[in-house]
C-alpha cells in the first residue's frame, strides 16, 4: 500500500525536511516486506488569502484516485501508536492500494474535505504547526512499520 502525505505549503531545506526524509526512507526500507510503501510527500501551493476552500480543491487534485483518505485534524481521533499501526495494517489487508494523509494549511482543512475523509487522526488536543505535523506523521508511519515487523524501535 503506497502512502502519500498530501500537504499544503512547501517545506524548505532544513532540519524538519531532513528528519521527514529520513523517517520516510526508513519506512520505505522496513515497510517493503510488510506490503507498505513507498511513501512520498505531495505538496500543494499555499495560496495566500485564498482560504481553506481553495486549498481543499488543490488537495483533492493531489489525491491519488481511489485512495483511502485520512485527515490530520484536531477534531480527529486520538489513537496510540500500536493502534495506528493496526489501522495501517487493516487498510493494507483490505486491499487498499493507496493511503493519502491530508494535512491542511495554517487554518486547517476545509469542512467539505474533512467530510470526505474515511478517517481522521489527531495528535492530541493541542494545535500543532502544519509543518510539525508532517514530521510527527512521518515518524509515526515509520514507527508503525517497526511495530508490525516486531522491531525493538517501539518500546512499551
UniProtKB/Swiss-Prot annotation:
<dbReference type="GO" id="GO:0005737">
    <property type="term" value="C:cytoplasm"/>
</dbReference>
<dbReference type="Pfam" id="PF02590">
    <property type="entry name" value="SPOUT_MTase"/>
</dbReference>
<dbReference type="InterPro" id="IPR029028">
    <property type="entry name" value="Alpha/beta_knot_MTases"/>
</dbReference>
<dbReference type="InterPro" id="IPR003742">
    <property type="entry name" value="RlmH-like"/>
</dbReference>
<comment type="similarity">
    <text>Belongs to the RNA methyltransferase RlmH family.</text>
</comment>
<dbReference type="InterPro" id="IPR029026">
    <property type="entry name" value="tRNA_m1G_MTases_N"/>
</dbReference>
<feature type="binding site">
    <location>
        <begin position="123"/>
        <end position="128"/>
    </location>
    <ligand>
        <name>S-adenosyl-L-methionine</name>
    </ligand>
</feature>
<comment type="subunit">
    <text>Homodimer.</text>
</comment>
<feature type="binding site">
    <location>
        <position position="104"/>
    </location>
    <ligand>
        <name>S-adenosyl-L-methionine</name>
    </ligand>
</feature>
<keyword id="KW-0698">rRNA processing</keyword>
<feature type="binding site">
    <location>
        <position position="72"/>
    </location>
    <ligand>
        <name>S-adenosyl-L-methionine</name>
    </ligand>
</feature>
<keyword id="KW-0963">Cytoplasm</keyword>
<keyword id="KW-0949">S-adenosyl-L-methionine</keyword>
<keyword id="KW-0808">Transferase</keyword>
<dbReference type="GO" id="GO:0070038">
    <property type="term" value="F:rRNA (pseudouridine-N3-)-methyltransferase activity"/>
</dbReference>
<protein>
    <recommendedName>
        <fullName>Ribosomal RNA large subunit methyltransferase H</fullName>
        <ecNumber>2.1.1.177</ecNumber>
    </recommendedName>
</protein>
<comment type="function">
    <text>Specifically methylates the pseudouridine at position 1915 (m3Psi1915) in 23S rRNA.</text>
</comment>
<keyword id="KW-0489">Methyltransferase</keyword>
